[in-house]
Amino acid sequence: MAQLIDGKVISTKIKDEVKEKVAGLKEQGCEVTLAVIQVGADPASSVYVRNKKKACEYVGIRSLAYELPEETTEEKLLELIRELNDRTDVNGILVQLPLPKHIDEEKVLDSISPLKDVDGFHPRNVGALCIGKPGFVSCTPAGVIQLLKRSGIEIAGKECVVVGRSNIVGKPMALLLLRENGTVTVAHSRTKDLKEVTKRADILVVA
């Protein structure tokens, strides 16, 4: 039987929990700081960046916004990331995707310190996820796990089907479900009879 999950209620609860933890860190003299870099003025990216800024304000995280022009060179962007990697007052670095075509996205993401890679895209964090070690995890898949757990949905032993195999959502989603002892199938553009594959799912994630 299908269950309707109210994501907004769960999201608010999580943000309130984070707010409490951030306040505790401030009492210990640590001001949590997130640096967000956007190259160009893609409308969708601008909306995402504004939402991240609002979320930071709500939970008490200091956010630093770096809005770079479309023509910013790859080297200039890498130079900024190196500076942020070295700053002791910056805890997390997030580069808003997509980047302009003249910039190597993979090279940029790999240049972020794994200790500040809050999006979980660095190969070291991806590798940690694969072998079940601690590390940053891609936000959307991590959010799905939180939605399931906080809704009282048992993952262990369930037939879990993930539709999509992207590095950002599909693959980490499958790995997180495996970590929770789900029986995972990944479907994609070459999957035969997608309808039959999805019909057998107890948990279906379209990624």
Q: What is the predicted function of each stretch?
A:
Residues 86-91, 200-203:
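Short acidic/histidine-rich motifs immediately flanking catalytic phosphotransfer sites
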Residues 32-40:
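Short beta-strand segments enriched in small/hydrophobic residues
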Residues 38, 94-98, 163:
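Short beta-strand segments
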Residues 56-71, 184-186:
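Short beta-strand elements in bilobed, periplasmic/extracellular small-molecule ligand-binding domains
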Residues 94-156, 173, 194-197:
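Anion-binding alpha/beta catalytic cores of soluble intermediary-metabolism enzymes, centered on
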Residues 1-28:
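Positively charged, low-complexity intrinsically disordered leader regions
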Residues 41-53, 135-207:
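Glycine-rich phosphate/diphosphate-binding loop of Rossmann-like nucleotide-binding domains
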Residues 76-88:
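Short, well-structured alpha-helical segments in soluble
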